């Protein structure tokens, strides 16, 4: 088993059972702890981590280092606020100050940067040799002598043989910093936070004590409905009354799709970088690039609030095709307003999670794969 498969072996941050100790058939002494652990197994105690709700950026913040590591290595939940994906700011900062060795505890961004540098250097060396070969051929055709610098076994210039380490000299540390506090935190989207809370591994803390009285599903839907960034109605921001929650509420449609793809075994990440709602990874960002880009299209009955024009679909599909992904149009069929209001107002008579399940069961997911037709590749 490779190192990555060992570190990221858990699909979810929950412990179902303690692993059995190793057993050697030729050594009877190893049978005793194995049999004891097998017969007297105990259910592991689930740890409930804490996070803080941030209404302004529609996210939940996790600051505990153990929780950050657990959520990332067991399902790739959230992203570092100072990193592209995995929270690696602390390691990168320590290396830039000379507190870590050049090859010590490499993170994904650094490995990627080194591979890009090696490819760039290889192409530069290849182009240099090709130019020298052409010059050598011209001299031979004109009957002129070939200088030593154009010989096939001539050494490459110094700037083409330098390694990344030569260009990555650690700058001086004028303040003699010996330790760097980790100020990075993990940001969870509302669907991720709700999913983890439903598993019982996350507790959401609120600055507003009134939020404690609301179920998480209703609270997140209210916050999204009141969001100025989504509604562009600044008067709602000042309202203290519960907003009108519609079946195609952005949080509810995203949550229904998030649960659907998580149940299919996909690792679901935010897709804002590629102008879509979600990206689907087979195992996770550490192992491979995303295979599919998901664009959510909420539908209430036979109507859609926003119909994309064909030129918009083609532009988006071309962008997705350029990054070697497949675009999936995910139609989220929402319940009718009457059916939705009937279940939504039934919250007081049900358990929080049973009520949330009854709400999500009203949503139906249909996926359509859209691929760009290329004549040179689709002749048959």
From Swiss-Prot:
It holds the Pfam family tRNA_int_endo. It catalyses: pretRNA = a 3'-half-tRNA molecule with a 5'-OH end + a 5'-half-tRNA molecule with a 2',3'-cyclic phosphate end + an intron with a 2',3'-cyclic phosphate and a 5'-hydroxyl terminus. The active site is at residues 281, 289, 325. Coiled coil: none annotated. CDD domains: tRNA-intron_lyase_C. Keywords: Lyase, tRNA processing. InterPro entries: tRNA_endonuc-like_dom_sf (IPR011856), tRNA_intron_Endo_cat-like_sf (IPR036167), tRNA_intron_Endonuc_cat-like (IPR006677), tRNA_splic (IPR006676), tRNA_splic_SEN2 (IPR016589). Its EC number is 4.6.1.16. Gene3D superfamilies: 3.40.1350.10. Belongs to the tRNA-intron endonuclease family. This is Probable tRNA-splicing endonuclease subunit sen2.
């Amino acid at each position: 088993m490779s190192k990555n498969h060992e570190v990221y072996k858990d699909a979810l941050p929950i412990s179902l059972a303690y692993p059995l100790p190793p057993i050697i058939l030729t050594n009877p002494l190893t049978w005793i702890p194995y049999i004891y652990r097998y017969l007297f197994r105990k259910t592991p105690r689930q740890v409930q981590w804490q996070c803080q709700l941030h209404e302004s950026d529609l996210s939940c913040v996790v600051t505990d280092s153990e929780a950050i590591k657990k959520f990332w290595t067991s399902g790739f939940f959230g992203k570092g606020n100072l990193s592209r994906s995995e929270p690696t700011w602390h390691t990168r900062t320590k290396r830039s100050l000379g507190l870590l060795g050049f090859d010590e505890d490499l993170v994904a961004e650094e490995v990627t940067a080194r591979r890009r540098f090696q490819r760039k250097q290889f192409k530069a060396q290849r182009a240099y040799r090709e130019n020298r070969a052409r010059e050598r051929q011209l001299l031979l055709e004109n009957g002129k002598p070939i200088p030593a610098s154009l010989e096939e076994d001539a050494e490459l210039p110094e700037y083409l043989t330098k390694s990344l380490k030569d260009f990555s000299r650690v700058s001086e540390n004028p303040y003699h910093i010996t330790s760097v506090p980790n100020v990075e935190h993990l940001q969870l989207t509302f669907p991720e936070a709700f999913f983890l809370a439903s598993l019982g591994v996350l507790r959401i803390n609120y600055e507003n004590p009134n939020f404690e009285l609301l179920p998480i599903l209703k609270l997140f839907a209210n916050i999204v409905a009141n969001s100025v960034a989504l509604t562009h109605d600044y008067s709602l921001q000042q309202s203290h009354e519960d907003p009108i929650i519609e079946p195609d509420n952005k949080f509810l449609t995203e949550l229904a799709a998030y649960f659907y793809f998580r149940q299919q075994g996909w690792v679901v990440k935010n897709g804002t970088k590629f102008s879509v709602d979600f990206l689907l990874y087979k195992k996770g960002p550490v192992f491979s690039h995303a295979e599919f880009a998901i664009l959510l299209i909420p539908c209430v009955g036979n109507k859609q609030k926003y119909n994309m024009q064909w030129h918009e679909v083609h532009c988006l599909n071309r962008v997705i095709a350029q990054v070697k992904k497949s675009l999936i149009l995910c139609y989220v069929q929402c319940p009718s307003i009457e059916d939705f209001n009937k279940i939504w107002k039934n919250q007081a008579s049900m358990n929080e999670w049973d009520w949330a399940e009854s709400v999500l069961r009203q949503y139906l997911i249909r996926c359509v794969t859209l691929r760009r037709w290329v004549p040179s590749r689709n002749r048959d």
